[in-house]
Regions:
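Structured alpha/beta or helical-core interaction and ligand-binding surfaces enriched in interleaved
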Residues: 1-122
Length: 122
């Protein structure tokens, strides 16, 4: 995978997901003040919580485009309500999308199956 593909993977995932998302993020070395201001404590050790409405989702995307914040994320879970929609690991270089997510053809061509897979369970 080239660097631009890895950098854009998280951005592209967020673009195909709906707004109003709950994210659990494990990123102990992330020092980006914009993202840190969005983070709240979560009920899970080592994870912070971020709620992404439409505006905050765009802010998050812009921070990743400008500062590659995805590189600092060890583990991310993105949910809509109780449904897990995406789980990513290791700088969000790869991940798994829910079978409930409508995946556009351009995303499939760019990322599936090498960078992203589709869960058959959730």
């Amino acid at each position: 995978m080239n660097n631009s593909e890895g950098k854009n993977f998280l951005v592209d995932v967020l673009k195909i997901l709906p707004d109003d998302l709950d994210c659990l993020i494990q990123a102990p070395s992330l020092e980006n003040s914009t993202i840190q201001a969005m983070m709240l404590d979560s009920e899970f050790d080592y994870f912070k919580s971020i709620y992404l409405d439409k505006e905050r989702k765009m802010d998050f995307i812009n921070e990743d485009v400008d500062h590659s914040i995805g590189n600092y994320i060890q583990h991310i879970q993105i949910r809509k309500g109780v449904e897990l929609l995406f789980e990513g690991f290791n700088g969000v270089e790869h991940g798994t999308l829910s079978k409930l997510v409508n995946i556009p053809a351009w995303f499939k061509e760019k990322y599936i199956p090498d960078t992203c897979r589709r869960s058959s369970e959730w």
